[in-house]
Amino acid sequence: MIIIGCDYHPGFQEIAYVDTETGDCGEQRLEHGEGAQAFYRDLATQGKKVRVGMEASGHARWFERLLAELNIELWRGDAAVIRAKRGRKKKTDREDARHILNLLLTGDFPQIWVPSGENRDLRQLLWHRHRMVQARTRVMNQLQAVALNEGLRCKKKLWREHGREQLEAFRLAPWASRRREDLLQLLDRLNPTIAELTQAVEREAEKSPQAGQLMTHPGVGALTALAFVLIIGNAERFQCGKQISAYLGLVPLEDSSGERRRLGHITKQGNSLLRFLLVEAAQVSSRTIPEWRSKYIHLTMRRGRKIAKVAMARKLAVRLFWMMRKGWNYQQIVKFGSHVEQPEHRHGVQ
């Protein structure tokens, strides 16, 4: 078996490898493109099992496809854990490749869960819609500014038929008029695109039984449910609500020592899109569920609105996690609670 530690960069990769059968080892720098492809294709022809370990990266899709095509095993590792396991102060690309190879050989490589190709493609749908909505919001804000400069303040009514007629009727200077026309054209192109993407999200959510169960929770729509299912993946990876909160970056930073305990802002680790959607959905849930509404008002008075929103988002994330893990809908999770059949754990924490 050939084991390879790969320090991956956008334009090249530094590798350190060893053949566990013959003991042959070496180091090499591979330029991406023909150089890397020729090296791995040559390995595949040798008839030996090959395992490549590298830090998780979002810019290596072509490399992952190449190794999958050649039936070469690829392990992705947690970059933060790999960095923490490095003992030497000297850091070079060659040292990093050696370090990854050593972790693979000793069995300490922190391998992480990797979503499937279909999962990743559906995430692109969610991100594309999210970016289109952000672009539309920027366009609408600029048009609101144009209306305010002309003394028209009608907020959401500006996007109705009468409001648009008022906006188009303003007599503006030449370049201001050009700006208004271009922004309106952009808005007219974005609206049908977003509507089409929203319908696609709803269709994909209908195909997923897990998303359908999550959508029974008040405030959780197709977008939030599908995003939660795609990003969490296998719910069995997590043992308790604290782990899911930490995975989504909804827990505070902590810098404690001795008797001093200092908590900061949330870590914001994990997927920012799902965190955003949970905050939005939690506000709707807080208006719908009486107990949550009381909790939200209490937190708002004690800690402020921003902290209260994040706290409710964390509460929603934990509840959706247990619904997904147990395969329950909203009525079942309310009736039986999150931690039924777990007498050995208190509050789901090991």
Short names for language-model regions:
Residues 1-350:
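A detector of single, family-specific signature residues
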